[in-house]
């Protein structure tokens, strides 16, 4: 069981610094931007437009990274059967998408491994703003334990601490912890797995929040100026002493009677539309450029004229950023399956987590056709299994190999 004072220090520091930042990032993804909380000027129109680049950046990244799902490969048929069973029971594709979404928004994600009454391994994503990793101080820091806190329906806060052997539950009130219970979990390691988006644990749109705020202000000011233009003042000179009745008659009859040197004109603000549109285009371009994301609405990407190679070239910076996320995601998936294998092996199984290979496939248009063409060219050079594993339309290489053998057997019988 971990030291209560140390747990409180980590809990207090996280609530003071990390939790507000992560909450703000999630709010931006949901469209709750700072411009909505800006002070109001009672003398001006108050349009506050949210241009949600954050959701666009995250949804494009998650779709590109996880749109075709994750596949696994192993030379052991029993291990592949176990992976298929556990993945199906846990709706793994949904979990992986949720983790990728948290990575893109918050720069970090977490999942909890547990087992149900039938001792079937389960994994569930946790909210990043309520989970605290605690590492040792070695050259290669290892996870000592993880803290999870949440509020119950009665308003009380519960703190759960997971280490390599046990889970301890505490009540948290007025800055103090009261220990309730400790139970073993049998995973052989800390059953909370952390996922990193990059080395700095930064979200995908976090570096461009100031640009997004600037675009929101510019767009809102443009609409406010247009509204001011619609409500502009009418200046009348040479009409003599006009009273409210005269002004009412002008509005009703739409006729103004002026002296010889009289004049009527609107007082309007000159708006440089070209400058504003150029500024908006520049800021929008900087948002996509500095976030390492491609604007999918660009004319060069909107059509179907580009080949797969040309599209990949246009997506190079985007791919570089996603590749970093993939490296960290792969390590965390390896930890997930290692612990699942360790738990199942306690019941007499002999699964090898190191023998599980993770295969990521980008969600690109035209990819299946190009992959099929490449598979045909590699036929006879690589083994049939290796070729099949890299076809994005095949989720289970073993099942596909079995179907091929069955079809070949039927042909021979005929």
Where are these regions (language model features)?
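C-terminal helix-loop subdomains that flank or include functional centers
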Residues: 282-414
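Leucine-centric amphipathic alpha-helical interface motifs
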Residues: 2-18, 237-238, 403-414
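Extended, helix-rich architectural segments
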Residues: 1-122
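Short amphipathic alpha-helical segments
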Residues: 75, 79, 87, 91, ...
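A short, surface-exposed helix-loop junction/capping segment
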Residues: 80-83, 264-265, 313-315
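Extended, regular secondary-structure scaffolds
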Residues: 110-200
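Extended, charged amphipathic alpha-helical segments
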Residues: 180-310
């Amino acid at each position: 069981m971990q030291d209560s004072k140390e747990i409180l220090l980590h809990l207090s520091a996280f609530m003071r610094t990390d939790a507000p930042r992560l909450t703000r990032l999630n709010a931006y993804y949901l469209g709750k931007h700072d411009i909505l909380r800006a002070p109001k000027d009672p003398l001006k129109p108050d349009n506050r437009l949210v241009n949600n680049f954050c959701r666009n950046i995250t949804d494009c990244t998650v779709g590109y990274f996880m749109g075709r799902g994750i596949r696994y490969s192993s030379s052991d048929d029993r291990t592949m059967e176990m992976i298929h069973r556990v993945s199906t029971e846990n709706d793994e594709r949904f979990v992986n998408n949720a983790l990728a979404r948290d990575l893109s928004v918050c720069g970090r994600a977490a999942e909890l491994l547990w087992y149900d009454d039938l001792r079937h391994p389960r994994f569930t994503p946790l909210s990043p703003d309520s989970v605290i990793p605690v590492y040792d101080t070695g050259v290669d820091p290892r996870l000592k334990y993880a803290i999870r806190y949440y509020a119950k329906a009665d308003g009380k806060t519960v703190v759960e601490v997971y280490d390599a052997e046990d889970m301890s539950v505490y009540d948290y009130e007025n800055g103090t912890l009261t220990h309730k219970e400790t139970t073993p979990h049998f995973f052989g390691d800390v059953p909370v797995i952390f996922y990193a988006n990059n080395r700095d644990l930064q979200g995908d749109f976090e570096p461009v929040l100031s640009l997004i705020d600037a675009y929101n202000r510019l767009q809102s000011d443009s609409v406010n100026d247009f509204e001011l233009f619609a409500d502009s003042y009418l200046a009348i000179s040479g009409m003599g002493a006009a009273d409210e009745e005269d002004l009412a008659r002008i509005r009703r009859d739409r006729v103004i009677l002026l002296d010889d040197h009289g004049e009527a004109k609107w007082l309007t603000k000159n708006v440089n539309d070209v400058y504003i549109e150029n500024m908006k285009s520049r800021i929008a371009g900087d948002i996509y450029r500095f976030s390492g994301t491609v604007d999918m609405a660009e004319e060069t990407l909107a059509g179907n004229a580009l080949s797969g190679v040309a599209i990949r070239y246009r997506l190079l910076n985007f791919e570089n950023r996603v590749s970093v996320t993939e490296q960290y995601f792969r390590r965390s998936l390896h930890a997930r399956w290692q612990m699942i294998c360790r738990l199942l092996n306690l019941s007499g199984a002999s699964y090898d987590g190191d023998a599980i290979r993770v295969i990521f496939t980008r969600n690109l248009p035209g990819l299946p056709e190009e992959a099929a063409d490449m598979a045909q060219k590699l036929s006879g050079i690589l083994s049939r299994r290796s070729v099949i594993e890299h076809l994005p339309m095949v989720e289970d290489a073993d099942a596909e190999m079995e179907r091929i053998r069955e079809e070949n057997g039927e042909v021979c019988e005929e």
